């Protein structure tokens, strides 16, 4: 994710898509099609506390030029144990998606489900 970027302007050029969440600092986070049948999530909400730390130090040890992940280590200091503040948000996002975009929109008889391709 740190080596790629999805530009909001590019997404907004596609009439079938809409940006659901984004920020000035981290960019586009969640994109959905207008039917709410397809979702695209950037970032790694599934990461545990130390995954990003392990990736960061792996790349540092390889001598790669890499920035310290913002807001991950206290005071952006890699010698400190990382924060772990996203788990509840990640679980809530998944639960809400499952409830509101899958269960509420899925017919009881799956034969009634419209195909994705028109």
Regions found by a protein language model. Name each.
Residues 1-51, 117:
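Pocket-forming structural segment of enzyme catalytic cores
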């Amino acid at each position: 994710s740190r080596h790629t970027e999805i530009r909001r302007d590019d997404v907004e050029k596609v009439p079938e898509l809409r940006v659901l969440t984004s920020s000035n600092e981290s960019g586009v986070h969640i994109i959905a099609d207008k039917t709410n049948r397809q979702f695209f999530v950037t970032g790694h909400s599934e990461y545990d506390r130390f995954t990003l730390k392990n990736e960061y130090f792996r790349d540092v040890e390889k001598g790669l030029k890499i920035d310290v992940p913002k807001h991950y280590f206290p005071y952006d200091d890699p010698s400190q144990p990382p924060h772990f503040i996203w788990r509840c948000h990640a679980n809530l996002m998944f639960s809400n998606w499952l409830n509101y975009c899958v269960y509420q929109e899925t017919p009881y008889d799956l034969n009634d489900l419209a195909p994705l391709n028109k």
